[in-house]
Amino acid sequence: MRKRKKSVLLFLVLVLILSGCGTKSDVITITNVSYDPTREFYESYNTMFEEYYKKTYNKEVQVIQSHGGSGSQARSVVEGCNADVVTLALEHDISLIEKTGLVDAGWIKEFPKSSAPYTSTIVLLVRKGNPKQIHDWDDLTRKGVDVITPDPKSSGGACWNFLAALGYAKTKWSDENKQK
């Protein structure tokens, strides 16, 4: 975690230093602050967007990417990271930014049924040969089975993991205590 903070700080310092070098550029820069699993998607998408923008408006645009845990990224924006666009994993991460006035109130209503603009797939990984015979959510509750997932305070994916488990429990049990 310290290494990541130092890397981000070093990156920001370099950006500030280099932004004062050279002549005035006609290149428009956009900073997209996003969560880790979207890194490869946005590398590809940004290239297409930059080409589209150049062709459509005859101006160059460069998208700068910043990636980390969704919750950590939301806090960095709240604490001053200069984001032009945020693409985060969870509603509450964007709502945190909304409280600062950086995102318009009621942003969620722009989506059908106030839904999240992303989906997530949960995959259960097991040891080679599946020695504990794990096939479904029920199997994760057996003694001797451990679940490893990121911290939901900093990872949108971890929140989706917990929500997926809760969703499964709700289809199986109507008793809220059993669901927990």
Enumerate the predicted regions with their spans.
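N-terminal segment of the mature folded domain
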Residues: 24-155
